[in-house]
Amino acid sequence: MKFCKPKPKSILSLDIGSKRIGLAYCDPLCITSNILPAVKRFENNQEIKIIRNYINEFNLTGFIVGIPLDEKGKMTTQAIDCKNYGQLLSNELKLPFSYVNEHSSTWESSERFGIKKDKSGLIDSFSAKIILEQWIEEGPELEEIAGKRQIKD
């Protein structure tokens, strides 16, 4: 499926892992992207408060969630977790969002930025930056109705 380049807007990108969520954001014209410190995931989703603070601080208007599909484009266990978290976040934040196939983004960030054996979350945030750059180039446009499903099981 080919998407059109999305309209410029300030967006938060999330690389969702089981322990941490890598974060990156772009300016309203989608010219520059920056990483933010990765946030730890909590059982009761306390990290949403931190994410909300970043959205308010940088006046972000939507978000994208990386979905790690397998090499055949099929859903993985982690992809299902990411998809569900994206739905939860959209419902909590009331913001439009989209999913982006992030197959191999961690490997790419490790190679591109020379990060090995990272436990700080830096590689997660650089992966979020790669996901964001991919979204800026390829889309898809954010769903204007928060919470609408875009990837089928």
Curated annotation (Swiss-Prot):
Main location (coarse class): cytoplasm
GO BP annotations, alphabetical order: rRNA 5'-end processing
Annotated Pfam families: RuvX
Keyword annotations: Cytoplasm, Hydrolase, Nuclease, Ribosome biogenesis
CDD domains: YqgF (cd16964)
GO cellular component: cytosol
Keyword Nucleus tagged: no
Subcellular location(s) of the protein: Cytoplasm
EC number of this enzyme: 3.1.-.-
MF GO annotations: nuclease activity
Known function: Could be a nuclease involved in processing of the 5'-end of pre-16S rRNA.
Family recorded in the similarity comment: Belongs to the YqgF nuclease family.
The protein, known as: Putative pre-16S rRNA nuclease
Taxonomic source organism: Prochlorococcus marinus (strain MIT 9301)
